[in-house]
């Protein structure tokens, strides 16, 4: 590749904090999700996509494009046709745990509201967490910090 090569990306303009972040190393076209179409990907010569779950990455979007990498700013990936991507050499990446702290904060808010309503301090409660993955691990840390058993 030439030394002045810059990858070309198409990004969903609704991705928070992304605008300008990659401009030093790549050429990014920011589009509303509904404008991320096959025709636009071809026109922009996009090699990569930065998307949310509203963009369905399947044959009808990707066929005939230069896209070789897809990154979704979501934990889920059911909007990406993994079989199509695999058979066409397109790498894809999701963002597991990307909203785990926010969900854990919400859970703790619900627990705090319950404690206020019942007039019982959280430190007197015992919490059972089913699964200590991204969200459960964050809930455990926050609950322990507040004295919950």
Please provide the spans of the model-predicted regions:
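Phosphate/diphosphate ligand-binding glycine-rich loop within oxidoreductases
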Residues: 47-120
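Residues at the C-terminal ends
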Residues: 43, 85-87, 145
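Rossmann-like dinucleotide/phosphate-binding beta-alpha-beta segment
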Residues: 119-149
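Charged active-site motifs of nucleotide-sugar-dependent glycosyltransferases
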Residues: 7-8, 91, 126
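N-terminal glycine-/charge-rich "phosphate-binding" loop or analogous flexible N-terminal tail
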Residues: 1-46, 135, 139, 147
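Short, structured coil segments at secondary-structure junctions
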Residues: 24-26, 65-66, 88, 146
């Amino acid at each position: 590749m030439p030394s002045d090569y810059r990858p070309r990306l198409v990004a969903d303009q609704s991705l928070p904090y992304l605008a300008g972040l990659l401009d030093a190393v790549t050429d990014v076209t920011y589009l509303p999700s509904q404008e991320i179409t096959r025709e636009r990907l071809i026109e922009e010569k996009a090699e990569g996509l930065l998307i949310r779950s509203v963009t369905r990455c399947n044959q009808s979007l990707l066929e005939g494009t230069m896209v070789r990498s897809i990154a979704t700013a979501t934990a889920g990936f059911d909007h990406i046709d993994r079989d199509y991507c695999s058979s066409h050499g397109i790498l894809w990446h999701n963002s597991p745990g990307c909203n785990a702290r926010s969900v854990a904060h919400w859970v703790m808010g619900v627990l705090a509201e319950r404690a206020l309503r019942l007039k019982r301090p959280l430190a007197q409660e015992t919490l059972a967490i089913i699964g200590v993955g991204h969200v459960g691990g964050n809930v455990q840390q926050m609950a322990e910090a507040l004295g919950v058993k």
